[in-house]
């Protein structure tokens, strides 16, 4: 185990004062479900993940605010949501091969299990939490910001359609997906018109179009227009 942690420290570019924090960051809950006796002197990584999530959001928000002083709130929110999404964090974790260092139950310990996006994202957040506790906010910031610099270019060049932008904003703020549904369908077959609605935090927004997809985009755009105000 000592060599395993030392190897990860080299990959992270960080030497921990309290290496047990790094060890805890790698402890998946499944291990304790399978071997509950371990709980007497070890704990899973969920508390560190919780802390790391908050540190990550703070550092990412501050970095975006400082790097893009003229960008509007809606765009910054979309970028932040993409940067801290499960997919995005899993990609960051994969560059460090975090999955291979995780302590898992026998049921989870498979090549596929170690590469699950949720597992990797949780590990990444837990490691951030461990860095923060061991060495403070500036060390955590120094660890996080290179990943932000690396990934922001892709987000800037990507043209997000309204439904994607709305989904990222709603997920970031409310941890849930927008809900779309068909309200009306009218007109002759050769000139069909659809009316779609989307519900965001109890508010309904509608849009029309020659296809359900177009109407869905229009509804999302209406929601974004209200959110951006």
UniProtKB/Swiss-Prot annotation:
Biological processes annotated in GO: mRNA processing; regulation of gene expression; rRNA processing; tRNA processing
Reactions this protein catalyses: Endonucleolytic cleavage to 5'-phosphomonoester
Domain RNase III: 5-136
List of catalytic residues: 53, 125
Protein name in the entry: Ribonuclease 3
EC number: 3.1.26.3
Coiled coil: none
UniProt KW Aminoacyl-tRNA synthetase keyword: no
CC cofactor: Mg(2+)
Classification via SMART domains: DSRM, RIBOc
Reported function: Digests double-stranded RNA. Involved in the processing of primary rRNA transcript to yield the immediate precursors to the large and small rRNAs (23S and 16S). Processes some mRNAs, and tRNAs when they are encoded in the rRNA operon. Processes pre-crRNA and tracrRNA of type II CRISPR loci if present in the organism.
Primary location class: cytoplasm
Keyword terms: Cytoplasm, Endonuclease, Hydrolase, Magnesium, Metal-binding, mRNA processing, Nuclease, RNA-binding, rRNA processing, rRNA-binding, tRNA processing
NCBIfam families: RNaseIII
Residue intervals of the DRBM domain: 161-229
Any single Pfam family the record assigns to this protein: Ribonucleas_3_3
Residues that coordinate or bind Mg(2+): 49, 122, 125
Gene Ontology molecular-function annotations: double-stranded RNA binding; metal ion binding; ribonuclease III activity; rRNA binding
Assembly, per entry: Homodimer.
Annotated TM spans: none
